[in-house]
Structure formats: C-alpha cells, structure tokens
Amino acid sequence: MRRDSSETKRKILTVCVRLFLEQGYKSTSVSQIVDEAGVARGSYLNLFPTKDKILLELTETMFGGQFGVARSIADSKLPPVYAYAVETAIQLTLTELNENLREIYIEAYSQPDISEYIYLHTTAELKQIFGANFPDATESDFYEMEIGTAGLMRNYMARKCDIHFPMERKLSRFLTAAMRVYKVPEEEQARVLAFIQALDIKAIATEVMVKLFAMLEMKYDFKLSKNGETEEAR
C-alpha cells in the first residue's frame, strides 16, 4: 500500500509541476491533474487536500536549489549583503521573464503555510548576513523583519515592469527599502546598488531559470513543452 501511495504521489507531482510551469498555477484544475496523472480523484485528495499542498512542495524544491549561483557572482571577499542583493535581484527578475513563475511566487508568498516556510527558510540566512548590524537581535527579531521584507518582495514581484517602472527602478526601490530595514549604511547601499546595476541581471536570471527548469524536470521526471519556456530561454 505504501509503495502504491508513493507512486501515486510521484505521478501527481510530476503532472502538477509541469502544468504549473506550462500553463500557470490558477489555470491548473484538479480534474486536469487527475486525468493527466491517471489517478483517482479520491487518491489525489487523500494525498493533497488542496493545491497549495503541492505548491508548498514545489516551493521547497525551488528555494532549495535556485540561488546557488548568487554566491558565485557575489565574490566571497565581498560583504554578505552583496549575495543578498544578487539573490533578491535574481528572484525579482525571474518573475519578469516568466509569467507562470510570477504566479507561482506570488501564490507562495500569499498562502499562509507556504509564506511561513519562506519566513523560516530565510530567517537564519538574514541573521547570518545582517547580524552584525543587530548585535542583540535574536532569530525571532529577524523572523519578524522577514515578514516585512517578504511583503516588499511579494508586492514588487506582483507589479509588472513597464516603460514607467523599468526593471532597474524596481530593483533599486526594493533593495533600498530592504537594506534600510536591515540597517545597511547609506554608503554601503550605494556600492551594492552600483554592483547590481553593473551586472547583466537579465542574462543571469535567464541562466538561473533554465537551470531551475532542468532541475525540476530531472527531480519530477517530466519534459517541458516549448510553450512552457520563455523566449529568453530558447
């Protein structure tokens, strides 16, 4: 029975992740999932009572694997705030490259259980990066600050770039607001922003997206259709 349940879960996840990336989270119905996975609706609901349970699993995979490149871009000799800036700039840019990724991220930051995972996942990293600015702060303090900066991230991801609000402006606004929360000195903020502006962040984010999709294809054993890719990724 356990093997059957494990196989059913694998089939469901394979179909769900592919459909979320190809057509979007909200456009993927339970009926479509069970039809394409070839499983009974009852079996699906036993394993995943709601779609956001699947989204949580996908979010854990994405957050676990998408940002390794940031550490290599931000030289280890630089202060850790540079890695934070690269990571967040990549995430904001990813959502401009692919509307289905935008929807996945916004849903993840909006669902209580998933946003809680994000807060907890990020808190330890924030303490490591910005701890020197808050010598008496606890992990709880950084958790509470992350609730605020995660809200900034969600809202900046949701607002699409246009001629009046280009990507460069979005990155600058988000990073300035976040760095002020974490008490980064103004002079250091200016250096970090100049560093980010000197990067080809769109090319970097495109590379991250291609690697992310490849990792998800391998983990969940599926192949994205060409329609699931952005023009930049082809």
Could you tell me what each predicted segment is?
Residues 11, 19-53, 57:
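Helix-turn-helix
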Residues 41, 62-69, 94-98, 102, ...:
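A short secondary-structure junction motif
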Residues 57, 68-101, 111, 119-123:
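Hydrophobic alpha-helical connector segments
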Residues 102-107, 187-191:
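Short, hydrophobic secondary-structure boundary micro-motifs
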Residues 109-161, 165-176:
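Amphipathic alpha-helical packing segments from all-alpha helical-bundle domains
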Residues 128-132, 162-234:
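C-terminal peripheral helix-coil segments that are non-catalytic and often amphipathic
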